[in-house]
């Protein structure tokens, strides 16, 4: 997946990314 999907613009892990990596 793209880093943009894992990190939001503020440099925090996005909720969607956490769901994908869970």
UniProtKB/Swiss-Prot annotation:
Pathway it works in: Amino-acid biosynthesis; L-methionine biosynthesis via de novo pathway; L-methionine from L-homocysteine (MetE route): step 1/1
Cofactor(s), names only, from the UniProt record: Zn(2+)
EC number: 2.1.1.14
One annotated Gene Ontology cellular component of this protein: cytoplasm
Keywords on record: Amino-acid biosynthesis, Cytoplasm, Metal-binding, Methionine biosynthesis, Methyltransferase, Transferase, Zinc
Highest taxon listed in the record's lineage: Eukaryota
Location in the cell: Cytoplasm
BP GO terms, sorted: methionine biosynthetic process; methylation
Catalytic activity: 5-methyltetrahydropteroyltri-L-glutamate + L-homocysteine = tetrahydropteroyltri-L-glutamate + L-methionine
GO molecular function (one): metal ion binding
Family to which this protein belongs: Belongs to the vitamin-B12 independent methionine synthase family.
Cited function: Catalyzes the transfer of a methyl group from 5-methyltetrahydrofolate to homocysteine resulting in methionine formation.
Protein name per the record: 5-methyltetrahydropteroyltriglutamate--homocysteine methyltransferase
Protein species of origin: Pseudotsuga menziesii (Douglas-fir)
């Amino acid at each position: 997946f793209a880093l943009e999907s894992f990190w939001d613009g503020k440099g925090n892990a996005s909720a969607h990314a956490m769901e994908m990596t869970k």
